[in-house]
């Protein structure tokens, strides 16, 4: 199975600083002393996934990890992976779409928040590639997030072995227009396919 791994290195930076999200405020957050959140959480997830695969040692179920080198991928992968090149200069939905189009993964594992989820779903377009979110942002209302990084690893492995089926889930995010008026309102921005698990998924 081809597992694409992407980390939004700016996700979650504003959490401890009281920001309502990190979109457009990453530099400000880092200047104020914010530390990486999404990357270390992805590493926790992949550490657990490696632990699971090593304990089972199944030859019939293997995982090939595809990732960019650098902070959006390779820096957080505790083992071998297939490099798809350096992290692009423009790390937006368009670069993510090109990543998906070029490598056609069977499952897309990402670390970030609701804003990251929206970018990925936009990048997927009409593709039915399933996604699993490692919780690493400030806002995580979407149903494609696992409850913890280690839960995300369990979901990935259970999907690889065929123990989980796919289901549609809602992609949610803060309505920025309403938020500018001082109101907190979360609304639906689309749908995504994700492995269904009441135990490990939100």
Which ranges hold each PLM region?
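Short glycine-rich anion-binding loops that position phosphate/pyrophosphate groups of nucleotides
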Residues: 9-10, 114-115, 137
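ATP/NTP phosphate-donor binding region
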Residues: 1-106, 153-202
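Short, acidic/small-residue loops that bind anionic groups at enzyme active sites
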Residues: 107, 111, 120, 124-148
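Residues at secondary-structure transition points
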Residues: 18, 118-119
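Alpha-helix N-cap/helix-start and coil->helix boundary motif
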Residues: 73-74, 114-117
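Glycine-rich beta-strand-to-loop/alpha-helix junction loops that act as flexible
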Residues: 68-69, 110-114
């Amino acid at each position: 199975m081809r597992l694409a791994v992407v980390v939004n290195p700016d996700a979650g930076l504003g959490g401890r600083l009281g920001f309502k999200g990190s979109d457009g405020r990453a530099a400000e957050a880092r200047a104020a002393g914010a530390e990486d959140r999404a990357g270390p959480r992805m590493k926790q997830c992949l550490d657990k996934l490696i632990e699971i695969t090593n304990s089972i040692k199944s030859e019939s179920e293997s995982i090939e990890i595809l990732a960019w080198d650098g902070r959006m991928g390779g820096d957080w992968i505790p083992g071998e992976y297939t490099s798809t090149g350096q992290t692009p200069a423009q790390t937006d939905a368009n670069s993510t779409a090109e990543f998906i189009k070029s490598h056609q993964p069977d499952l897309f594992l990402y670390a970030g928040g609701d804003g990251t989820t929206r970018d990925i779903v936009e990048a997927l377009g009409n593709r039915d590639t399933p996604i699993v979110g490692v919780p690493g942002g400030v806002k995580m209302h979407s149903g494609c997030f696992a409850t913890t990084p280690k839960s995300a690893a369990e979901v990935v492995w259970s999907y690889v072995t065929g123990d989980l089926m796919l289901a549609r889930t809602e992609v949610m995010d803060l309505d920025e227009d309403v938020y500018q008026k001082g109101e907190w309102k979360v609304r639906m921005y689309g749908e995504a396919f994700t492995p269904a698990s009441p135990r490990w998924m939100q």
